Amino acid sequence: MTVDALSNADNQDLRDNFIANRFLSHEAKLLDQRRFTEWLDLLDDEIRYIVPLRLMALDFDREVRADSFHINDGKVNLKVRAKRSSVSSGWGETPPSRTLRLVGSVMTDRIDQEGVLEVESAVIIYRQRAAIGQGDVLAFRRTDWLRIDGGTVKLLKRVALLTDASLATPNLAIFL
C-alpha cells in the first residue's frame, strides 16, 4: 500500500472501515464476556458460520477443501451452541472458558451484493479454562460478510481459517 492509496481513500472507504472495526470490536467484547444472547442478535437470520478443515500442503490454494469442516452452522445450530455454553450441563465448557480476543489487520471491501461489506481480519484468541496451567492460543484469519441495512449491521457469513492444521486445543466450543 502506498501513501497515495491512503490519501486517495474516499469517505465511504473510511466509513466502511469504521463500521467493520466497531462491529468486530463490539462482537469480541460480547463473546469475551459470554453475553451470547446479545451476540446472537448480531447475526443475520441467513448466517453461515464456517470453520474449514486446514490441510498440510505446499500450495496455499490446496490447504482448504470445499467439503471438509470443523464447523458449518446456520443460525439454529449457533443458538443451540450458545445456549449449551451458558448452562452448567454444557460439559464442553465446564468450567466456562475465559477468553480474550484480539482482532486486527482489518480490511474492508464493497462487493456486488447490495448492502454487503466484505471484511478480512486476523484474530488471536487466548483461552483459559482451568484455575492454573497453560491456556490455549488460537490464531486465524477471518473473512466476514456484514449486511448493512439502514442503521443495522448483521453478520451474514463468517469463514474462519485456523492457522493450525492440527488443533492444540481440546475443543472448538468457543465462537471464533
From Swiss-Prot:
Q: Which GO terms describe its biological process?
A: 3-phenylpropionate catabolic process
Q: In which pathway does it act?
A: Xenobiotic degradation
What EC number(s) does its UniProt record assign? Answer: 1.14.15.38
- As given in the record, the signal peptide range reads none
Q: Which Pfam families match?
A: Ring_hydroxyl_B (PF00866)
What enzyme category does the UniProt record give? oxidoreductase
Keyword Repressor carried by entry? no
Q: Which GO terms describe its molecular function?
A: oxidoreductase activity
Specify the superkingdom. Bacteria
Q: Which Gene3D superfamilies match?
A: 3.10.450.50
Give the catalysed reaction(s), semicolon-separated: a 1,1-dimethyl-3-phenylurea + 2 reduced [2Fe-2S]-[ferredoxin] + O2 + 2 H(+) = a 1-methyl-3-phenylurea + formaldehyde + 2 oxidized [2Fe-2S]-[ferredoxin] + H2O; isoproturon + 2 reduced [2Fe-2S]-[ferredoxin] + O2 + 2 H(+) = 1-methyl-3-[4-(propan-2-yl)phenyl]urea + formaldehyde + 2 oxidized [2Fe-2S]-[ferredoxin] + H2O; chlorotoluron + 2 reduced [2Fe-2S]-[ferredoxin] + O2 + 2 H(+) = 3-(3-chloro-4-methylphenyl)-1-methylurea + formaldehyde + 2 oxidized [2Fe-2S]-[ferredoxin] + H2O; metoxuron + 2 reduced [2Fe-2S]-[ferredoxin] + O2 + 2 H(+) = 3-(3-chloro-4-methoxylphenyl)-1-methylurea + formaldehyde + 2 oxidized [2Fe-2S]-[ferredoxin] + H2O
Q: Which InterPro entries match?
A: NTF2-like_dom_sf, Rng_hydr_dOase-bsu
Q: How is its activity regulated?
A: Activity is stimulated in vitro by coexpression of a [3Fe-4S]-type ferredoxin.
Keywords of the record:
Oxidoreductase, Plasmid
What is the similarity comment for this entry?
A: Belongs to the bacterial ring-hydroxylating dioxygenase beta subunit family.
What interactions and quaternary structure are annotated?
Answer: PdmA (subunit alpha) and PdmB (subunit beta) form the oxygenase component of a bacterial Rieske non-heme iron oxygenase (RO) system.
Tell me the function of this protein.
Part of the multicomponent N,N-dimethyl phenylurea N-demethylase responsible for the initial N-demethylation step during the bacterial metabolism of N,N-dimethyl-substituted phenylurea herbicides. Catalyzes the mono-N-demethylation of N,N-dimethyl-substituted phenylurea herbicides to their mono-N-demethylated derivatives. Is active on isoproturon (IPU), chlorotoluron, metoxuron, monoron, diuron, fluometuron and fenuron, but cannot transform the N-methoxy-N-methyl-substituted herbicides.
- Its name, as the record gives it, is N,N-dimethyl phenylurea N-demethylase subunit beta
Organism whose genome encodes this protein:
Sphingobium sp. (strain YBL2)
